[in-house]
Design a protein with these regions (language model features):
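Short amphipathic alpha-helical interface segments
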Residues: 10-22
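The C-terminal cap of the DNA-recognition helix in HTH/winged-HTH DNA-binding domains
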Residues: 19-22, 33, 51
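A short alpha-helical element within helix-turn-helix/winged-helix DNA-binding domains
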Residues: 26-36
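Key DNA-contact positions within bacterial/archaeal DNA-binding proteins
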Residues: 40
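Basic amphipathic alpha-helical segments that dock to polyanions
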Residues: 45-50
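Beta-hairpin "wing" of winged helix-turn-helix
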Residues: 54-62, 66-67
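C-terminal regulatory/oligomerization modules of transcriptional regulators
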Residues: 76, 92-141
Length: 141
């Protein structure tokens, strides 16, 4: 199982945005500089986040992005879904009768990996952007 840079960077950028969201809109350029993420890549990610109503853009000289909801209402699952990031620990499809080995039955460890995927998804369902901001603030003190 591997999260791609798209998913990891989306979360990093949104934690950065959430830290400054109460002050003014935050520019992608500022996030790019603080987090070391390519501006072009951030633009692609934020287009998806905007389309899925996680963020909204503010135009003008002091423009940038703001969260569309409170940070405590945005779960990691929402972010990953918005950028088309899927957590998948098994190769076979959930409803398929064929297993990940291409045979008619599931592999011997299928249930283990399926259970792990459920635990990971439950963790992401429970963890909010606010949790990550608080966690980051506590470690910096």
């Amino acid at each position: 199982m591997k999260l791609t840079s798209k998913g990891r960077y989306a979360v990093m950028a949104l934690v950065d945005l959430a830290r400054f969201d109460n002050i003014n809109p935050v520019s992608l350029r500022d996030i790019s500089l603080r987090q070391g993420i390519s501006l072009d890549y951030l633009e692609q990610i934020f287009a998806k986040l905007r389309k899925n109503e996680i963020v909204q853009s503010v135009r003008g000289t002091q423009g940038g992005y703001v969260l569309n909801k409170k940070a405590k209402e945005i779960k990691l699952t929402n972010i990953f879904n918005a950028v088309d990031e899927k957590v998948k620990t098994v190769q076979c499809k959930k409803d398929s009768k064929k297993g990940c080995n291409g045979k008619a039955t599931k592999c011997l460890t299928h249930n283990l990996w399926d259970e792990l995927e459920n635990h990971i998804n439950n963790f992401f369902d429970e963890k909010s952007l606010e949790d990550l901001v608080k966690d980051n603030s506590e470690k910096r003190v």
